[in-house]
Each structure stands twice: as structure tokens, then as C-alpha cells.
Amino acid sequence: MRLRTLRSDGAAYVALPDGRLARVDRILGGGPPDLLGILVAGSLNGLAQAVSAGVSDTACVDPDSPVAEPWTRPRKILGIGLNYGAHAGDLGEQAPRTSPASFLKGDHTIVGPGQPIVVPPDIGRVTAEAELGLVIGRTCYRVGVDEAMSYVAGVVPVLDQTAEAVLLENPRYLTRVKNYPTFFSFGPDLITIDEVLSAGPLARLRVATLHNGAVHRDDTVAGMTFSPAELLSFHSHVMPFYPGDILSTGTPGAVPIVPGDVVGCELGHGLALLTNPVV
């Protein structure tokens, strides 16, 4: 199942991107109108059952409505650094082997699909990085690797931006270089984990950084130093995760961006595509 947020008549609606854009709040017969609220309320299973039973006459979103950010106020966005060896080499670094490197991003960094990524004029080289984002479906704290993925509601394509020139001055500037406005894009759809796994094991899922329509770098989840389950389990022993939190699992390769570029994240071969212009 896929869920998408669209803006229509000054409001945001969650819809099924099924051709009709059926409104999820009408399918559920009420409840939270936003995707984060649906996750917090634990309504995904009920929604899946209702959709399996068949969606007949229900209100639909105007198909010309623009796609919005899936949600804008997660309690936590956790990013992972240097989780692919090849990307670590791009920066002249070694990929961490004993435990993952991580950082937090504020929700002010969020933009939606198709919205501009703004490169500040005074920070030098900026890169965009395609990543697989895990969306947490229920509160998760101190869980084992074997059970970690049961706490994941689904996945989203992510574009995580970095002020790389500043980072190369001093790696302790990591929080600073990751937290400029528009430095985190995700969407357009939340793809539930069962749909992702129906296409094959997560380890085989391809993650690709796109630059002006061409593949800049790609790899599969199997190429990660720490698997998604290991990342979530490890960090759940540091901090609790809550529904709607996003764990962005690292990039196979970063691409320098300048105004006029279009960058993208593709998951699988056509499973999901996120693009943003650069200004």
C-alpha cells in the first residue's frame, strides 16, 4: 500500500495514489486527517484491511492537486553517515566498522517532492545524497536486530543535503552542515513495508542518486556496512523512536549540486522516485 499527501483547496489530504486518489480519512470513516496522525494512531492496519475489502464510492482528491511533504513534524529525523564504503572513500574517510555514525536533523529542513532545494550562497560546495528512509510505525526502544524491522511501517525515498565544503573544514561541524533549510526531502509516497518486501528481500533493494536524469551512483541495501535492522536496533538502545520518525540509512554516493540542477532518489528499478530542482 502507498500513501501520498496532496494539497487541495488550502488543505492537505492523504490519498491512495491508485488513479482515483481516494481520500484516506473517508475510507477510515474519520480519524486523523494527516499521515503523521495516522501513524501515531496506529491506523495503518485498519486502513489496509479496508482497502483490501474494496474502496467503492468515496471522496477523492483533485488529480491536479500538487504533491506535498508526506508530513512536516516528525519528532525525529536521524541520519546515518558513511554507511557505504564507496561514499566514505569519496570523502577520504573510512566507513565506521564498530558502530554507525549518526546525526539529527530538524524538521525545518523538510521540503516535499518537486519543491526547490536552496543552495545558500556562502557555504561552498553542497551535495545531495539519495537514501532509503525507514518510517517508524510504533514506539521502539531497546529492541533487538531480529525484531527491529517489525517496528517499521514503511519506507520513503530521501534526498539528504550536506554543506560538504564546511564539513571538510572540520568533521565536528556535522550538525551545522546538515541543517540548512530544504536540506531534507522525502516522498512522494510512504510505501508500506509489506509492499516493499513483496518485490524481494530488502537487501536487494537498489538505492540510486540521480543527477539531471542520469544515475550518479547506485548500490543495494546489501552494500551497507550496517543493515537497516542493525541501524534501528543500535540507535534504539540510545534513544526511543516514535511513529513518524524517519531513519535515513546512508547514501551510496553524493553528487555536487548547483542552481539549475535536478536531483533525485530512486528506490528499486521504478519502485519509487523522488526529484527536486536546485535553486
Model region roles, listed by residue range:
Residues 108, 113-150, 157-161:
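Non-heme Fe(II) oxygenase catalytic core, chiefly the N-lobe of the double-stranded beta-helix
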Residues 72, 112, 127-129, 242, ...:
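Residue-level recognition of short, solvent-exposed, well-ordered loop/turn junctions
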Residues 1-96, 214-215, 264-266:
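N-terminal non-catalytic cap/leader segment that marks the start of a structured domain
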Residues 23-27, 93-94, 144-156:
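Short Gly/aromatic-enriched secondary-structure transition segments
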Residues 75-78, 100-102, 108-109, 116, ...:
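Structural motif
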